[in-house]
């Protein structure tokens, strides 16, 4: 077998492979002999059909099958011989395909980039630390109460946090516009659900009152036909209802499936959940900084095939998440290219760190992670048992643990600054940078 390789770009390879005619004929004859043993042809006993008859009837099909298998087999033999690591399937172009002659074909494909992860000492990480103090716990209890608020009709003027039942008709340039009208809609004042000025304009309104609100759609409003335009809404208030927060009692505690009784038992369980959330938030922020640092210090070119595969995965995830009748390939690839590129780059860089430092998932950390996740459930022992019986889930946990070990490895070499902050600051999501 003859092999030559041409580097057509940083990652693309054009490999020409020649397969001797003798090898082709051997494979063709092998298939014809297999066919002869089971062929049923009128006038001949099974297994006794002359090879000349078998060849006349079946040689073309056997040759096509043999050539297809040989191209696949010799391609992988060639990449092993040339020490290449293909990233995706090759595009195959036959050059010589004549019977009785050597087979020659060209395989064009991309390879994984070869690089060494460096620049660990250029990575700067701010590692937060925080505690759950009593005031944080009190605030969380109020949040839980507000999440379970109920509303009672009140005979008074509307205030912020009241729930109004309203009918409204919206007009732009004196014309009713699509989606601008509704009846019997529930609206909590101050929720920010409506465009600026709408909810504020209903503060002080009473049941049965009609108000005309003059507002302006934001410049970045999702409906471009309405963005930046002035609108007039005629609103009729049907009812005004005031919020009633639930009492912190046994009935309230049961809604959260907490076995501990009494306010102190409830506070203890809520604190545990907050501490678990805090640990995850701090860990996530450190990981994001490490990954950002690795990307900045190690710019690499990634194979187009991997990017396309990742874009397609993100398309499928988007359809599964948001539903609807749309098909994944109907979503524009541009929506996912930036995220796909980051994920592919990080996947390659993280894999290389694992290889460079010979990292393997730590069994103790795997157990600890499973127990941490299980502690959020009412029957943690059952959750732990479920994980250990499910190999796919175990592999996912091992993968997460291995990423954490990569982060720890980088932190040992990076510039790390510790900073003490409040619980609220520690768990606050990091805002994505705005596009220019």
Curated annotation (Swiss-Prot):
From which domain of life does this come?
Bacteria
Q: Which UniProt keywords apply?
A: Cell cycle, Cell division, Chaperone, Cytoplasm, Isomerase, Rotamase
Q: Report the subcellular localization.
A: Cytoplasm
Claim: Transmembrane helix is one of the keywords in the record: no
The EC class name is isomerase
Gene3D superfamilies, alphabetized: 3.10.50.40, Trigger factor ribosome-binding domain (3.30.70.1050), Trigger factor, C-terminal domain (1.10.3120.10)
Q: Which InterPro entries match?
A: PPIase_dom_sf, PPIase_FKBP_dom, Trig_fac, Trigger_fac_C, Trigger_fac_C_sf, Trigger_fac_ribosome-bd_bac, Trigger_fac_ribosome-bd_sf, Trigger_fact/SurA_dom_sf
Q: Name one GO biological process term.
A: 'de novo' cotranslational protein folding
Q: Can you state which reaction this protein catalyses?
A: [protein]-peptidylproline (omega=180) = [protein]-peptidylproline (omega=0)
Q: List its EC numbers.
A: 5.2.1.8
Q: Does the keyword Cell cycle apply?
A: yes
GO cellular component annotations of the record: cytoplasm
Molecular function terms from GO: peptidyl-prolyl cis-trans isomerase activity; protein folding chaperone; ribosome binding
The cross-references to PROSITE patterns, in alphabetical order and at most eight, read: FKBP_PPIASE
PPIase FKBP-type domain mapped to chain residues = 161-246
User: Any domain commentary?
Assistant: Consists of 3 domains; the N-terminus binds the ribosome, the middle domain has PPIase activity, while the C-terminus has intrinsic chaperone activity on its own.
Role according to the record: Involved in protein export. Acts as a chaperone by maintaining the newly synthesized protein in an open conformation. Functions as a peptidyl-prolyl cis-trans isomerase.
- Return the similarity comment: Belongs to the FKBP-type PPIase family. Tig subfamily.
> Which PANTHER family is this protein grouped with?
TRIGGER FACTOR CHAPERONE AND PEPTIDYL-PROLYL CIS/TRANS ISOMERASE (PTHR30560), TRIGGER FACTOR-LIKE PROTEIN TIG, CHLOROPLASTIC (PTHR30560:SF3)
UniProt-recorded name of the protein? Trigger factor
